[in-house]
């Protein structure tokens, strides 16, 4: 166990730190908006996404990572050969009609559970690091530039 409480080496501590810093940037941007602004379509245009849809999307990926990390820890993990586009469509549909509060709570809970599973791994490996990056820092990076622009646009309308 490292001084920071992580059972992993430096590369893995870096993965957690990257996840943390990007998550807090993302959430800081979201908190700059009113609940009504979070429901405004336009974050993406085709298909039309709101910030609620973005948080629902991120939250479902975090929840999926939690499941995969559980399987890694239990020795039942079968690899990450998956159809990302199909999962994105499935996750978007699952969260599409959820209220803002549900999408927000689900994203925060998904992240918390994913991190709990990460820290509970008895034998962390490259697959675990792949999931923490795919669902966390790397995934947030895919969305942060557009979110910054969209938040600036929404705030500018006030």
State what each model feature region is.
Residues 13, 30, 51, 102-105, ...:
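Extended aliphatic helical segments
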Residues 22-29, 61, 110-113, 117, ...:
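Amphipathic, well-ordered alpha-helical segments in soluble domains
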Residues 87-127:
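Acidic/histidine-rich alpha-helical segments that form the ligand environment
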Residues 2, 40-86, 119-158:
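Short, contiguous alpha-helical
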Residues 16-23, 51, 100-107, 133-136, ...:
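Hydrophobic packing residues in well-ordered alpha-helices of helical domains and bundles
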Residues 7-11, 43-46, 92-99, 128:
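Short amphipathic alpha-helical segments at helix-loop
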Residues 4-38, 60-70:
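Alpha-helical bundle segments that constitute or directly flank the non-heme di-iron/ferroxidase center
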Residues 4, 18, 23, 34, ...:
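Sparse, context-dependent recognition of short Cys/His-centered cofactor- or disulfide-binding micro-motifs
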């Amino acid at each position: 166990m490292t001084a920071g409480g992580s059972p992993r080496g430096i590369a893995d501590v870096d993965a957690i730190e990257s996840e943390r810093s990007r998550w807090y940037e993302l959430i800081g941007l979201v908190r700059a908006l009113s609940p009504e602004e979070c429901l405004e379509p336009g974050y993406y245009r085709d298909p039309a996404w709101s910030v609620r849809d973005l948080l629902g999307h991120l939250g479902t990926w975090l929840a999926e990572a939690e499941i995969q990390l559980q399987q890694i820890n239990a020795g039942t993990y079968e690899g990450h050969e998956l159809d990302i586009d199909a999962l994105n469509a499935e996750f978007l549909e699952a969260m599409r009609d959820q209220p803002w509060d549900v999408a927000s709570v689900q994203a925060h809970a998904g992240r918390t559970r994913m991190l709990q599973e990460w820290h509970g791994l008895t034998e962390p490996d490259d697959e675990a690091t792949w999931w923490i990056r795919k669902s966390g820092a790397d995934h947030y990076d895919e969305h942060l530039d557009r979110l910054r622009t969209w938040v600036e646009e929404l705030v500018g309308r006030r």
